[in-house]
């Protein structure tokens, strides 16, 4: 590097403006530039850095030396070249590894721009070597002129040239020649290419190899990847100081070479005609490495005949990577001549962050033979490589990608200067930069630039082989692991062959993407490019681009079935998608008009494809309601129009709920799937469609449709109304239709179903009549035709015409339809296809008995559903027959639980009969109290069946058939959870006692497994829980019953009947019988309305669940649920409303959960006021208001998903506990008042006496053990407490804490109980307080007080106390009552009576 630095000093001294042209010197003198120039509005001035100065100059000089030696012959062909070079302040970039290129570059503000560049150093020498150059006026002032004068003159010429060009060419061309910092309007013809014009400068042939190599090194250092900017920046209108060397754009450096092939136009101020389009190419110094590598592996240049292909032909050609061969030349570029029919093509790359400019001058065609020779030379040295095709398949949308690009690659070859770790400019220009040439494109000359030294002399390669299926921004985000292997050898001459497995590294492209400067430039480019879209040749872009891109993708990745539309959704940068879609018809959109079929079998709708990955926790609180619910009518179509089609509904629909969509599908004969099954035909998608369902639907090939498309699918099958202009089977001119009078015999209308050539009619009996033509001129219908008269065509005499075909869709002759309605009385399925089993076909028809009893299962095979449960139940019964010892784990009873009407009782009876048991059934209507059950069941095991006494003798053997047959009995207790009231009190406890010692099976049936009445019974029974049978299991049996009874129903009607009965088979059969006896005709349309008119009994828990889930639109339905049990349903709502997850849609979206709960609680508080008024004042007229405030309003706020199962109201338990404790306090108060020690009220008893008594009843036992027993008994006697009062005091004072008796030893507890029960205590008995006799005179109240034997002798012998006791008769209770000697009552010493012994001292 030191040696290179020494070599660099010479070119600086040779040129007077070298201090301004070189990068380092330009950075040092940045303050000398005029302030306030417009270029500073775009770029910020950064600090100078001269670290890489020597290396750059050395490389430039060496490169120019080599290029002059090899391409001396091509120096004569150089044209005027303007170079805009973007330099970056980096050092030793040539030594960086590919991994270093991937690392983000340091974000720097834009450097100040100098008008001169490193190439000005050798401008005089280039003029000498270029005798044919006549465009000296186009060059800026060279070395001798001062910097300010040179800038002014250059800006003046550029400004004039731009003004002149605007009048003769498109707006993009004028901006191309202008001296603005960003030539943006030149982009508009190619919306995928960003044009940046930093320095407009005359490009001449370098003097020495030193300057050429220095420039090469300088350009290599400035190579970087750009991401498309976002923010707009103000476009300068003032004089712009155009520095000669570099301007940085978010650390991404490029050189843009403008090649003007019109060498004859020597006047710089002369406007450029439209045919003379400048060619602007991005030039980077390291392209010398890149192009040599490409030279060996790129495609063979096309022959002149191939370059004549038009845009339409490119759709059939495979996209081939165009080789780059112009880097071999060091002379000014002689661009490809293009006919004036083709406008200037500028590619604006929005999807890709590459900023590139391409413009082609289409006038010059000279020296084409020499260029073709150069191409043939390249052809020999660079054979076609198939991997180049895949390399060209980038997802960057380039308008023209065909073989004609090969003929233009020479003019764009200087653009191949980007590092291969990113998307190089040469990648863009080689493949897509030039549109197909319609004529005159056969003479192509490789472009030769002084900034690209010869590869043969300096074979440095930096271009790597990029093998990518298709370049797109989406793949950048999706596949960051696709990397590009870049081989960089700064000073080696070895050529590295490209690897076919190398991938394009998309990660590097977006380095420095967030720079505010980049975003500002990008927005400015987008804004200005939109204004020039009208100048784009749309036909030569969209067709070519989309076709070739698809072919490239299919070739590179045949298994990639993902469309670009889907990959865009997965991207992280929405900026590129918005920009690419903002061009409308003029933009090249990868998703627009695909001409190559993809491997997806499903045609997805743009509305159905989600734009973002749905959040899995989005509907954690419930799915929202449709935003436009109720805005669309239900579809009407032909019967069974969806038969044979399977649908899957996903997402939130616009108008219908998910259940409503399922109902519509089933109504018209379709099937609903819950997941993406193989037979799936359609996925009806809404907002936030499920990701797994969407992927599964695509895999199975299902078509993705929206809600509107689904409704249209049904509506379009509806028969069209009668048209008076229909043509018939007789070809007639189309005259004015004349209506005919309606005959009186017409009794019903008809509906047009299809457009056929005959008129199909039905007679009054419903039999289809023959097809008859309608005669014209008869003034009416034929006599044999039933139905309304239809307008017929008036024809010439005798000519007949037929009206549109008519078909009656209603089977009953009395039913009529109009042309806009559909008759649906005919079932979707043929009743002939229903198979009636033998067990049903043998039953006589009619309504003599209930169908439930008539069609009750006769064998176990007739039971629908739960086969495994019944099999296990049969095995349990088998153990009672076996002689082997019973399993100890087997219990003596079984508990069959499940919803009503699913066959619990029928299964129990059938299985008992099958296993040889005689069932004794106790139904809920029977008395099942403790005494009644004991009376009925205690001696069942000893009973004998009456049939045993009537044995029959076998004629063959002469023995009694029943003699050796043992009769077994099973007890069936149906609806065990229905025990209630005093009549059944104690029945469950008695049953449990019988089960423990029973020698026969007990079969208990219940509906509510979680009922508190069954809680104790569950511990002694084997649980067998039955489930509701599915619709498929039940529908076949219900259809068989309906067919046997002569009904015409459809599977849809059966489903509605079954679901309306809450999966109750018994109720469904009753409903079918009701429909059969009714005179009303039922069909798919009116069956739902008819079923809603029927009342069904539901439990309070089911009613509360439906209220919490039901939509607020039907208040009457919610009130019906409330009145099912108006005392319990509000309590269930109050218990579970806090646990319900609101849906969050509709009106709920305006509030958060806390606000919704608060408003629901306020409504419940108001309802309590109405409930109190109803209970105390008997104001039953407030009951509907109570239902609204307690159920409807709270459920409207928190409607959603309630917890299942619903919790039982805890209020009832708490109320019961509070009542019990109040009773404890009342009893304690009464017992304490019976003594003369206290007279307190309830509050004082609870607050003061209970804590004190607790301490004195427990602490002596804890501290003194057995010695404290006497003290505890004395306290209890002083206050008249019983043993139950002691336990109640502990319960009242514990409040959920630990039992204080746990600290008392077990031996002390037992001793206390024995001693307390062994002694006599005064007890309180309210019944003894009443006096005997009506008068009550002479009755001693104290006589009624009971005394317990065994009282202490001390109390008996106290005479003084005895007299005091007599005086205090009003006392309710006395501890001891001692009779004096004068008492006449007999003394008893042994009997337990109300008197005690009296002793005298």
Curated annotation (Swiss-Prot):
InterPro entries: AAA+_ATPase, ATPase_AAA_core, BRCT_dom, BRCT_dom_sf, DNA_pol3_clamp-load_cplx_C, DNA_replication_fac_RFC1_C, P-loop_NTPase, RFC_lid
Domain BRCT: from-to ranges: 637-727
Stretches with biased composition (Basic and acidic residues): 1-11, 55-111, 118-130, 227-241, 361-382, 465-484, 499-509, 548-558
Sequence similarity: Belongs to the activator 1 large subunit family.
DNA-binding is among the record's keywords: yes
Biased composition (Polar residues): 577-588
Annotated compartments: Nucleus
Subunit structure, as described in the record: Heteropentamer of various rfc subunits that forms a complex (RFC) with PCNA in the presence of ATP.
Low complexity composition bias: residue spans: 242-252, 310-339, 400-422, 438-461, 485-497, 589-616, 743-765, 799-829, 1391-1401
GO cellular component: DNA replication factor C complex; nucleus
Entry protein name: Probable replication factor C subunit 1
SMART domains reported in the protein's UniProt record: AAA (SM00382), BRCT (SM00292)
Biased composition, class Acidic residues, residue ranges: 174-186, 559-573, 1344-1365
Disordered: annotated segments: 1-639, 721-829, 1334-1401
One MF annotation (Gene Ontology) recorded for this entry: ATP binding
Residues bound to ATP: 898-905
PANTHER family per UniProt: CHROMOSOME TRANSMISSION FIDELITY FACTOR 18, REPLICATION FACTOR C SUBUNIT 1
GO biological processes: leading strand elongation; mismatch repair
Record bears the keyword ATP-binding: yes
Composition bias, Basic residues: 149-160, 193-204
Alphabetical UniProt keywords: Activator, ATP-binding, DNA replication, DNA-binding, Nucleotide-binding, Nucleus, Transcription, Transcription regulation
